[in-house]
Regions:
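N-terminal amphipathic/basic-hydrophobic helices that include classical n-h-c signal peptides
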Residues: 1-27
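Non-heme di-metal
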Residues: 31-300
Length: 300
């Protein structure tokens, strides 16, 4: 069992490293360079630095800018990329914490494996409003169509990926805005090149922990009829329910398990947490600028 797990871990590291080196060769080591931690922060819920970053994210001006359907369309046309790349983080955890190769062997930590598999189950094949199995990405795309948001750029990006283009090239050819491209590439860099500690921390602090508060902030401040955004409202409420009640606490426990109280791993988790939150702030700021530019053009 130990030999098998070590072999699987080695293959995963080799695969991730190879992908990262290949991406760096394509990009000139710019977009796909590993995020640098500007300062170490203490990995505790009460830490001032981490709480300050989280507060900056949750008080972002973007939530107050999504006040009409056109602004919501701009938001969704960017946010769909975050909905998509979420699965790369989740799949990275699944590869590391469960057995995804043949022959199958039991995972070392069944509780962690169960948590990750539940995430995958919900994200890849949750039940829609109509009771049909559907991925959360598909639900989000349906919600975009309901509010009149364009899926053209995202659809083209996925088409290019499916037809063999590398991520960097697909982002460029699909004309994905830079702030979105940087968010996606940082997520994929962590997913494919990060350690299990980095991925688990990025997953918790960049996704599971802030999502309920972010989505609540959006819902509480928008000025659009719920009837016109029925599918989006259902999607947001579903994530608030799952991430707030189940996935968030489980992701916190998972991170504690993989760090094991070891100082080096805690520092690694700290750095990943900081980078994850800052990446989201940068994405929000880019979307806010797009909305402001739209309003400026409309006023002329």
């Amino acid at each position: 069992m130990r030999l098998f797990n070590e072999r699987v871990a080695a293959n995963l590291i080799q695969s991730r490293t190879g992908l990262r080196h290949h991406m760096n060769a394509i990009t000139g080591n710019n977009l796909f360079s590993k995020p640098r931690c500007e300062s170490d922060i203490i990995f505790t819920a009460s830490n001032g630095d981490l709480e300050c970053l989280k507060e900056k994210l949750l008080s972002h001006d973007l939530y107050g800018a999504v006040v009409n359907v056109r602004a919501l369309q701009v938001f969704m046309e960017a946010h769909v990329f975050a909905v998509w790349d979420f699965m790369s983080l989740a799949k990275s955890l699944q590869i590391a914490l469960t057995c995804t190769q043949l022959p199958w062997f039991p995972p070392e930590d069944a509780s962690s494996a169960r948590f990750v598999n539940e995430i995958i189950l919900n994200e890849e094949s949750d039940l829609s409003q109509e009771g049909q199995a559907q991925s959360h990405l598909e639900m989000y795309l349906d919600a975009m169509k309901e509010v009149g948001a364009s899926t053209a750029v995202f659809d083209n990006f996925l088409f290019l990926l499916k037809n063999g283009k590398e991520v960097e090239e697909a982002l460029n050819l699909a004309n994905v805005p830079e702030h979105i491209a940087r968010f996606v590439t940082e997520t994929l860099n962590i997913s494919m090149g990060g350690s299990i500690v980095e991925v688990a921390s990025y997953f918790l602090y960049g996704r599971e922990d802030p999502i309920p508060d972010m989505f609540n902030a959006l819902i509480n401040r928008w000025d659009v009829s719920d009837l016109s955004v029925n599918k989006l409202r259902w999607y947001l409420d579903r994530h608030i329910e799952l991430d707030g009640d189940e996935h968030g606490p489980a992701a916190q426990k998972l991170l504690q398990q993989v760090t094991r109280g070891e100082p080096d791993k805690i520092r690694l988790a700290n750095c990943a947490a900081q980078n994850a939150i800052q990446a989201r702030i940068n994405l929000w700021s880019g979307i806010l600028q797009d909305i402001a530019a739209l309003e400026s053009t409309s006023a002329q």
